[in-house]
């Protein structure tokens, strides 16, 4: 949610942000109109209520000949107060509905355009020349099957399309990768949290995921009425809902480990083979609560953390600055790290990090106490540190001619010192 005072004073900035996102500019005018109606309706109600109280005080002390008139006036005014109250409540509801539709204000530096209008910030790592090495690279699913590590067929049998089993050394590789990510996060001052994967509607709405991505989210209907999270960002944002934080000693940094669930409603025909786009996966997510003035520095820190982790798994990658039209409603700016996938001949997203400024905090009522005793909204940021999809890039970029997988050096201590995953026949 945005600051209404900012919208009143800088409507042109908010409209420009909406335009860059490809969203309704007229919504800003709707917010301002409903805000004016809300304030005037509330003023009428409060004036009538004050008059009602004043007359009520006079009734007890009034002479008998005036008391009847005052009582009649009180009854008449009571009806008006009820009408003004109903009008004020309706105006407040209309205002709130409009406000919650507005997306966060895009940072001026974010590129204009849509999904394909990102800007490449830099590329890191050398892309392998498999032709020079004398063999055609296999895709991650073929490799995973070859080491008895990825079983899509039985996953589909059990859970339906886009489900899978990770087994043996590939399952160990995922645990190793996620554990390595947690260790790195803790070294940088993050606190590990195993988070809920079911959240209340108010928390899901507060983080902004029910705006344009509601169809991507699994929902449990009544009597539960809860949502399955697609990232631990949701639970970590909701953890301090309705709280006043102390950020005088620096940002609060969390590292969430959870299973995640996504419907992939708009993914028909996309990535139907393998584990790039699935309904369930595991992820380590960074989440930060920071002072408003520190959010940009923290965003750079999260991106550096992601790069450090990508360096450990030794895959070529690039960083892109996501265009405004491809940002989620909560993000003011977002950077993606995309790894090279040899068999696809292109980069695929492995991580993203977003600065959500005060947008989520206002919706969830998360504030900090200032030196003067007043409170203000904090900034929230998030970034992926490792997730199941990383296995795709690791398997393909570290494959050997015989179908074995060389384990990245940094991961070997997490896999008992093992250096290579050898081809293995399925035992069952």
Curated annotation (Swiss-Prot):
First-tier enzyme category under EC: ligase
Biological processes, Gene Ontology terms: selenocysteine biosynthetic process; seryl-tRNA aminoacylation
CDD domains named in the record: SerRS_core
Binding site for ATP: 262-264, 278, 349-352
UniProt: L-serine binding residues: 231-233, 285, 384
Subcellular location, record wording: Cytoplasm
Keyword vocabulary terms for this entry: Aminoacyl-tRNA synthetase, ATP-binding, Cytoplasm, Ligase, Nucleotide-binding, Protein biosynthesis
Recorded catalytic activity of this chain's protein: tRNA(Ser) + L-serine + ATP = L-seryl-tRNA(Ser) + AMP + diphosphate + H(+); tRNA(Sec) + L-serine + ATP = L-seryl-tRNA(Sec) + AMP + diphosphate + H(+)
Entries under InterPro entries matching the protein: aa-tRNA-synt_IIb, aa-tRNA-synth_II, aa-tRNA-synth_II/BPL/LPL, Ser-tRNA-ligase_type_1, Ser-tRNA-synth_1_N, SerRS_1_N_sf, SerRS_core, tRNA-bd_arm
Gene Ontology cellular component annotations, sorted alphabetically: cytoplasm
Alphabetized Pfam families for the sequence: Seryl_tRNA_N, tRNA-synt_2b
Main localization category: cytoplasm
EC numbers, comma separated: 6.1.1.11
Coiled-coil blocks: none
Family: Belongs to the class-II aminoacyl-tRNA synthetase family. Type-1 seryl-tRNA synthetase subfamily.
Function noted in UniProt: Catalyzes the attachment of serine to tRNA(Ser). Is also able to aminoacylate tRNA(Sec) with serine, to form the misacylated tRNA L-seryl-tRNA(Sec), which will be further converted into selenocysteinyl-tRNA(Sec).
Subunit structure and binding partners: Homodimer. The tRNA molecule binds across the dimer.
Free-text note on domains in this protein's UniProt record: Consists of two distinct domains, a catalytic core and a N-terminal extension that is involved in tRNA binding.
Name of the protein in its database record: Serine--tRNA ligase
Organism: Bifidobacterium adolescentis (strain ATCC 15703 / DSM 20083 / NCTC 11814 / E194a)
